[in-house]
Amino acid sequence: MTDINNLFFELIQVAIGTRICLSHTPSADEWGELYAMAMKQSLVGVCFAGGQKASPQPSPEGMGEKSLLFRGDLEEAYIPEMLYFTWMGMAVKIQQRNETINRQCVELQKRLSADGFRNYIMKGQANAALYQCGVKNGSVSSKGSSLSALRQSGDIDVYLEGGLDRVLAYARTFGEVKKVNELEMSVPVFSETVVEFHYRPFIMRNPFKNRRLQAFFQDQSEACFTNRISLENKAESLEIMAPTIAFNLVHQIVHIYHHFITEGVGLRQLMDYHFVVKHEMEVEKGSSVQEVKKVISDLGLERFASAVIWVIGYVFDPGMLATWIQKSETTLWKPNEKDGRLLLDEIMMSGNFGHTDERAKDILTSRWKAFWFVNSKTFRFWRFDHWAWFWSPVWRVYHFLWRKMKGFK
């Protein structure tokens, strides 16, 4: 890892409360790089929280333009004024967006339930609710806010009980359904927010592993349909139905792996998983550890999970990583540094869902380019799944034919 990468990780750690201060005072150029990295990884709001001990001060000599002074517990760090206000503006927009999506999640679930569909919200706002570490000494809003309000939200992913045909028929009552795949469909519920109706929580392309995964989801379904969690909104108390921690531990590791060997995965997904693991170990007291380890073993993802555990420890909580290495029985999987560094290098290159990965810039222009790009990754990362090189292209061909037979685009 480069020095700027390590400084970026320190900024994240300060934001989430696992570090007191940065190891050195960033220069104006370094602050610019940190902001660019936060943008690339979709962590703009969370990283801004790392600087929430700010107070206006005169610019020190040699810094050039007027700056704002950040006082950490052990040091001072300067950030250029224009960059600060740009960053703060992004953070405020993220807060406002989260407030909107929180209300939309509640509204959507009320409608689905009234129409006879048991459901639960996956990822997104359900993950944000686990961001329990508060921002110290104020926030981007005058009333203060926890990190959950600063997590960059995307679309709304909601699982509906009933299977493809029933869910699709219902989705069409909202308007034209333009995209249907093996998991989900895009439904025009809200004009400003993409909503995905899932008729499966997720899949694996290996049919034998997928059978085991679907069995796990089915076993967890009753608990998920009744698992009520609270969302943070300024002036109102909001609740949604969301997956259990055991469900999240399996579902999100499979989700991370899928995006890792396709377009790419970013640190936002790893931060989500960090808070899922933190909740399991600190709140649930490890009650699901043995069950989750068994399922991940059955899915053949133990080695990948060990890489993920190393990454979330190294990036988000180095102190906890040291404990996990010394006492591997206290965590889900023993951290694997060699594989973890490989995974982290890919994460830093690809960014959030690979949107800034120069290696993948042509995959949206050609299905064949996308096909070969993904298949080449299954060979490169053979260590994590010895049969992905076979099942990935087989599944993609099958899925293409399935969509054509169903009349889906």
Question: How should these model regions be labeled?
Answer:
Residues 55, 67-69, 77, 139, ...:
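Intrinsically disordered, low-complexity segments enriched in serine/threonine/proline/glycine
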